[in-house]
């Protein structure tokens, strides 16, 4: 017994619908692939400091962007093969993706507006990185030294490190603590990623609407599903 899916997309489906679908799907694929590569590099770098488990946002973004890439590939194949089952699978993937992406993006935006909670997390990470660098080859040219050089700052705060600096060796006049600079940078990154995710969600929602429109344009044979008996 062989199962045959007799649903096929209408060959006369206007290009006005199919064209935007392919364009939007390609845009989402490109943006998600860029995000996948970026978060992969960040995770690789953070893993060197054993920080991946402390920073769930990069890991979550990596998993979500990988899911986006897979979803867009399924969508591309669904359009190419013109099969209803594959297209329905793509739509289910897309709904799950939109829900997850909106949730993660909203959390990033909310976290960026909560400086006290954010400050505590960043401070703990700075402390762990500092301890790790003191006992490893990464003491010089490590992430703390890079931050101090870039912002011309010294240490995290007076309560944490006093007059100690990785790069400047001692506190000099004009070298403030790094906490305000790092916190501001992290807040900006979280806000940027949050709105980036919201924009992607809107594009995916439009793609979902186009996908639904495709289903209305399918042709049905006399029997939507048929079974062929073979000897």
UniProtKB/Swiss-Prot annotation:
Keywords on record: Membrane, Transmembrane, Transmembrane helix
Segments passing through the bilayer: 22-42, 59-79, 84-104, 196-216
Domain of life: Eukaryota
Localisation: Membrane
Any Pfam family matching the protein: Tetraspanin
Membrane topology: Multi-pass membrane protein
Main location: membrane
UniProt record similarity statement: Belongs to the tetraspanin (TM4SF) family.
Name by which UniProt lists this protein: Probable tetraspanin tspE
């Amino acid at each position: 017994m062989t199962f045959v899916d007799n649903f096929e997309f209408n060959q006369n489906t206007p290009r006005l619908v199919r064209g935007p679908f392919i364009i939007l799907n390609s845009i989402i694929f490109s943006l998600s692939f860029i995000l996948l590569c970026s978060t992969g590099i960040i995770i690789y770098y953070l893993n060197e400091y054993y920080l991946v488990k402390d920073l769930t946002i990069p890991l979550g973004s990596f998993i979500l962007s990988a899911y986006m890439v897979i979803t867009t590939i399924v969508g591309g194949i669904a359009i190419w093969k013109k099969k209803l089952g594959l297209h329905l699978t793509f739509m289910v993937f897309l709904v799950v993706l939109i829900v997850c992406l909106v949730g993660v993006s909203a959390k990033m935006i909310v976290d960026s507006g909560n400086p006290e909670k954010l400050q505590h997390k960043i401070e703990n990470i700075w402390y762990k990185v500092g301890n790790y660098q003191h006992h490893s080859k990464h003491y010089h040219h490590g992430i703390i030294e890079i931050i101090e050089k870039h912002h011309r700052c010294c240490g995290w705060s007076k309560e944490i490190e006093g007059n100690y600096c990785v790069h400047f060796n001692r506190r000099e006049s004009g070298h403030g603590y790094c906490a305000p600079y790092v916190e501001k940078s992290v807040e900006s990154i979280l806000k940027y990623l949050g709105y980036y995710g919201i924009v992607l969600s809107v594009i995916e929602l439009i793609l979902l609407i186009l996908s639904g429109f495709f289903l209305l344009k399918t042709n049905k044979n006399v029997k939507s599903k048929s079974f062929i008996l073979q000897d």
